[in-house]
């Protein structure tokens, strides 16, 4: 034990050292000043305040390259840049695609700046003149460092991180195959997070940022109608506001800090999801389900996304793990873990009413015996569960699930006719690689089409090149085959308490989605991101469907080929974004 601890301590110290070196070598943005209506105001990035439509304003900031050999400024103007000056030299901003596009933004590298300046330097004074198109006005700018030393520090840090994972896994006697699959998921999320701007492929990111800023800067939780997303439960935003404050103290871009915080939460979701699968399956079925969970595209897409989805996934996975361990061992301490995680999940995202449904079923299955037979920990767990369930029921019955539904426009309205819930348009699903909330021809009217397609790629057209379309089409085709394996696995499964639990979980998640779409008839109400943890019900059936003892060798080979093709294509697509 001492040797293991000694090794782990050295690994942690090594990671801390290279994290500090990376921070020291990174460039930074400082001295941000907003010039508006004759008033100069010191600001921090991002700058986002209410302005009049057509109002002109300007922003100054200093960019220090530090020890970084190179850097790239990622600038998102709100809404249009009208002039761009660096160290007194006007830059040809109109040649930068995205200079008048908040969502797209534009990149400004050190090499581009030096080319226009005619000389190299490490300190840059940037002056931007902008015009607001309406609503909030301002700018978001992030600086990312480059150069050999930063790359070297990052590589060494992540090598030490992988070694730390294997060391911890060995200590807790976790299967090497699961550790390897976890590392695959870890590296995939590192690569995707590192290459993804904080608001890329996000949902209501501006509202989430506003929510965090209010808590971080004003030390209060805002009223539910104070911002676009302020109706959400506060747990995730309070935690993120703490990260935001720490980032400001360290002169680090707060949105990037929150992005990496979400990445860490995604590892909790990944790890506890694998632990759940290990309590449901074993052998080859476990390996297949675990690999799919690790690389499932929509799950990876959520990893760096600013929003409360990923914390809900993590807490639901912890709660499900607690329920499964309690069923397997009858130790009440696991049910206490499940109750606490469920309560946190509900105060993170209201979708966690399903988490409490799973918890309630576990309670009924395990506590339906004379109270005298309950252990002390089970009695404590029962008391905590009842108190938490009453609290959640009171809140759920008195609050809207979607507090900003009235703000959606008619372009995302859909028809809730019965046929749209029973029909699956297989041709559209296979021939149209992506979907979105606006176009009927992409399948948004059909409940199962939209749910299945967003389970893979979200509501985004990820990569519209020939390569991206080919990969997305292959993934969609493999999905249909995996669905077939899942139905077979469900049919042949032996029904014990664990199978009942995951089946009821799947039913509750799908029923919740149907109810949400019926109550709020918008295409975005049908997005799979609300129920990603349902994969922890479905993937065991997929793995069991082609890897069970009764499966023929041909079926096993076919199933593994499809699983590996799905996994490889998903990784290639995500790393091509």
State where each predicted segment sits:
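Transmembrane-helix signature of polytopic, membrane-embedded enzymes
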Residues: 176, 252-256, 273-295, 314, ...
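Transmembrane-helix motifs of polytopic, lipid-linked glycan transferases
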Residues: 159-166, 256-281, 314, 318, ...
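Perimembrane helix-loop-helix junctions
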Residues: 171, 322-328, 355-389, 393, ...
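Extracytosolic helix-loop segments that constitute the early lumenal/periplasmic catalytic or substrate-binding loops
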Residues: 190-195, 205-231, 235, 243-246
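Hydrophobic, aromatic-rich transmembrane alpha-helices
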Residues: 163-168, 370, 450-499, 503
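Loop-to-helix entry region of an early transmembrane alpha helix in multi-pass inner-membrane enzymes
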Residues: 234, 238, 248-271, 469-473
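Aromatic-lined ligand-binding clefts that engage carbohydrates, nucleic acids, or primary amines
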Residues: 63-87, 126-130
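Short helix- or helix-capping micro-motifs
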Residues: 185-188, 289-294, 342-346
């Amino acid at each position: 034990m001492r040797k293991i601890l000694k090794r782990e301590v050295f690994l942690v110290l090594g990671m801390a050292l290279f994290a500090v070196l990376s921070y020291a070598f990174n460039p930074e943005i400082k001295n941000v000043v907003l010039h508006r209506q004759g008033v100069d105001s010191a600001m921090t990035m991002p700058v986002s305040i209410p302005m009049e439509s057509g109002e002109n304003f300007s922003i100054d900031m200093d960019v220090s390259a530090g020890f970084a050999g190179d850097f790239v400024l990622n600038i998102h103007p709100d809404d249009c840049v009208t002039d761009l000056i660096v160290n007194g030299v006007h830059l040809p901003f109109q040649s930068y695609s995205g200079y008048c596009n908040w969502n797209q933004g534009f990149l400004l590298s050190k090499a581009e700046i030096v080319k226009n300046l005619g000389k190299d330097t490490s300190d840059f004074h940037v002056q931007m003149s902008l015009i607001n198109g309406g609503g909030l006005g301002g700018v978001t700018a992030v600086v990312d460092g480059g150069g050999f030393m930063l790359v070297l520090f990052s590589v060494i840090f992540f090598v030490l991180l992988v070694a730390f994972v294997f060391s911890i896994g060995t200590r807790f006697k976790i299967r090497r195959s699961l550790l390897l699959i976890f590392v695959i998921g870890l590296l995939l999320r590192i690569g995707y997070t590192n290459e993804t701007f904080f608001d890329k492929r996000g949902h209501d990111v501006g509202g989430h940022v506003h929510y965090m800023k209010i808590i971080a800067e004003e030390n209060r939780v805002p009223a539910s109608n104070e911002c676009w997303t302020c109706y959400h439960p506060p747990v995730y935003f309070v935690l993120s506001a703490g990260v935001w404050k720490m980032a400001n103290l360290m002169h680090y871009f707060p949105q990037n800090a929150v992005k990496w915080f979400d990445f860490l939460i995604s590892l909790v979701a990944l790890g506890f999801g694998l632990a759940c699968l290990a309590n449901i399956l074993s052998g080859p079925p476990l390996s297949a389900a675990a690999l799919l969970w690790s690389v499932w595209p929509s799950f990876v897409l959520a990893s760096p996304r600013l929003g409360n989805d990923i914390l809900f996934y993590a807490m639901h996975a912890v709660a499900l793990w607690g329920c499964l361990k309690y069923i397997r061992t009858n130790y009440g301490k696991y049910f206490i873990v499940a109750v606490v995680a469920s309560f946190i999940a509900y105060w993170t995202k209201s979708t966690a009413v399903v988490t409490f449904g799973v918890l309630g079923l576990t309670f009924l299955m395990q506590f339906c015996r004379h109270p005298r037979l309950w252990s002390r920990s089970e009695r404590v767990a029962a008391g905590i569960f009842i108190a938490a369930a009453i609290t959640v029921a009171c809140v759920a019955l008195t609050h809207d699930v979607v507090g900003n539904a009235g703000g959606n426009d008619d372009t995302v309205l859909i028809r809730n006719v019965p046929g749209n819930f029973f029909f699956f348009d297989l041709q559209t699903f296979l021939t149209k690689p992506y979907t979105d909330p606006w176009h009927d021809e992409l399948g948004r009217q059909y409940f199962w089409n939209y749910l299945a397609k967003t389970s893979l790629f979200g509501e985004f057209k990820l990569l519209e090149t020939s390569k991206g379309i080919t990969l997305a089409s292959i993934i969609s085709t493999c999905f249909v085959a995996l669905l077939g394996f899942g139905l077979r696995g469900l049919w042949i499964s032996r029904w014990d308490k664990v199978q009942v639990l995951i089946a009821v979980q799947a039913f509750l998640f799908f029923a919740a989605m149907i109810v949400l779409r019926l109550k709020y008839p918008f295409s975005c109400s049908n997005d799979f991101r609300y129920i990603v943890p349902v994969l922890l019900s479905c993937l065991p059936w997929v793995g069991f469907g082609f890897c069970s003892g009764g499966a023929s060798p041909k079926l096993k080979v076919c199933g593994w080929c499809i699983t590996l093709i799905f996994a490889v294509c998903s990784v290639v697509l995500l790393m091509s974004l």
